[in-house]
A protein has these predicted regions:
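Secondary-structure transition/capping motifs at alpha-helix termini
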Residues: 222-228
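Conserved acetyl-CoA-binding loop-helix of GNAT-fold acetyltransferases
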Residues: 206-220
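Active-site/acyl-donor-binding loops of N-acyltransferases
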Residues: 9-37, 229-295
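Short, contiguous acidic/charged loop-to-helix segments that flank catalytic cores in large enzymes
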Residues: 200-210, 239-246
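A conserved beta-strand-loop-helix scaffold within acyl/acetyltransferase catalytic domains
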Residues: 8-207, 225
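Hydrophobic or amphipathic alpha-helical targeting/insertion segments
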Residues: 1-4
Length: 295
């Protein structure tokens, strides 16, 4: 019905394609929150890997805050580095300043930072606690050896070894600063939905799972805890769901981890203002496709 209405007005549909759209996304990933009342039920709705990522970020000293208008340079720097790595076009700081001026408080520029000193202090305290526990278990084992105590000693020793590796990483991290920007995201609030418009992350801090916590906090603050019921539009996916080698596979799996569903839109339309020019453009496009197919 929609297609017929547009066609009756002279518009031409560009087709039911897949991939990332240049004019408009034809495929989006959308999350609604029926039955979600608080953070506990929100986390429970995620896939196990995503839930682990959110919890890992929090226990790794990652904190999310909103950027002020005078801090947009940090956002732009992270997005620019991400764009260079992934091959999409980054906007400059002036663009985002104008964006903020236009949308005002509805444009939420969020930053995930690693609080390295806080992380190091927490891991050190946990290390001391485990070391004391291991000493206590060994003392009890020497006094009265049991299989149960031996198992507890082995488990605690393994946990202590893993924690020592994290401590070494945290000590190295503090050389980059006490608070380190790791990822950013722009959420835009509308009456019925919040849009996860664009984001960026620094690969050297991938292990800290900052992007997962950013999305979680966006959903929690701007949808679940909002007085205005909203859905969460995670925006573009390619629309290819059964090809593990598709260019958008990683993005799809990341978004799927937060639950939700794919939403297929009608796509792009054009209105020819010159029949001759339109036919020439279509012919050139067809020739290009044939050449690409023949390679």
């Amino acid at each position: 019905m929609i297609l017929d209405a547009y066609r009756s007005c002279g518009w031409r549909h560009r087709g039911f394609d897949t991939g990332y759209g240049k004019v408009v996304n034809r495929w989006n990933w959308v999350r609604t929150f029926d039955g979600i009342k608080d953070e506990r039920t929100l986390l429970a709705s995620y896939k196990p890997r995503t839930r682990w990522s959110v919890n890992r970020a929090r226990t790794s000293g990652v904190r999310v805050r909103e950027l002020g208008a005078d801090e947009l340079g940090t956002f732009v720097d992270i997005e620019r580095k991400t764009a260079g790595r992934r091959g999409f076009m980054a906007r400059d700081e002036d663009y985002y300043r104008r964006f903020k001026e236009t949308f005002g408080s509805r444009a939420r520029f969020m930053l995930a930072e690693i609080h390295a000193d806080e992380l190091l202090a927490g891991l050190t305290a946990e290390h001391d606690r485990l070391a004391d526990r291991l000493d206590s278990l060994r003392t009890r084992y020497e006094a009265h050896a049991t299989t149960r105590l031996k198992r507890q000693i082995d488990d605690t020793a393994r946990n202590l070894t893993a924690l020592e590796r994290r401590l070494d990483e945290a000590r190295a991290l503090t050389t980059h600063g006490s608070v380190i920007p790791a990822a950013c995201a722009l959420f835009v609030e509308h009456r019925r939905e919040t849009v996860y418009l664009t984001a960026g992350a620094l690969p050297e801090y991938r292990a800290y799972q900052a992007p997962a916590l950013l999305v979680h906090e966006g959903m929690l603050r701007l949808c679940v805890n909002s007085t205005q019921p909203r859905r969460f539009n995670m925006y573009g996916i390619t629309g290819v769901f059964n090809d593990p080698d598709d260019e958008g596979r990683g993005v799809l799996e990341f978004k799927q981890g937060f639950d939700g569903h794919a939403e297929e839109l009608a796509g792009a339309f054009i209105l020819p203002t010159s029949t001759i020019r339109y036919k020439l453009s279509e012919a050139a496009h067809t020739i290009k496709l044939l050449k690409e197919a023949g390679r």
